[in-house]
């Protein structure tokens, strides 16, 4: 009875306590895994520049290599989603690590475009398997929305860190960072539950039943929205640093802007969390879409200083 009467900060702290006490080890390793698994995605501006400046790829080739890497990430995640309830999760993670490490290791030796193209697909596929298990762990937690918020907040810091560190490394150095981060997961595989634990299913009210047909379509609408969002991200995020450097912008300024833009996403996550707690999910989403559309529109129509 006391828990139901809590509001505001007290309720938020109680939710955090429940989430952490549920299975903090599994949550911790899943958080690490999702940050490493999405490492190429969030660091793609820096990595794309490295492919051009250090390996001599053209901008068209960079787009294809990045597309293969992220396409592999998607393919690995889809395959894992099909089998995750029937296969030991530790085995799935271990297989993903092996594939990603071997593919990244071969990239140390092979630098020609055709070979790198397929090696990046394999690396992405392994990352997709690895990351899909981590995302599933968040989804099966006792407070999934809070767990995903934690993931988004953490992305801001990991992305800023990548933007700061990766430009200082050689191409092989970047590959070694990913190899080391994947291998560092192995000692903690025992923290991952082999199979999802069952939770009691809550009874649905008659109000929910009346909206059942909408509930069936809602996940697919959300997936389609995510699909379109990531197409937009891929369209500019791969080339954002290359485009800035091509226009003779100071490289140090470009690096600083990317770092601070990453940290600003932390503020966006905080505002979205506060708004969603008070007004639900729709209004923060509409505000975010309007803000992004306005920003891209300003850039498209000549704001370049």
Regions found by a protein language model. Name each.
Residues 76-89, 268-281:
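Helix-to-loop junctions at the C-terminal end of transmembrane segments
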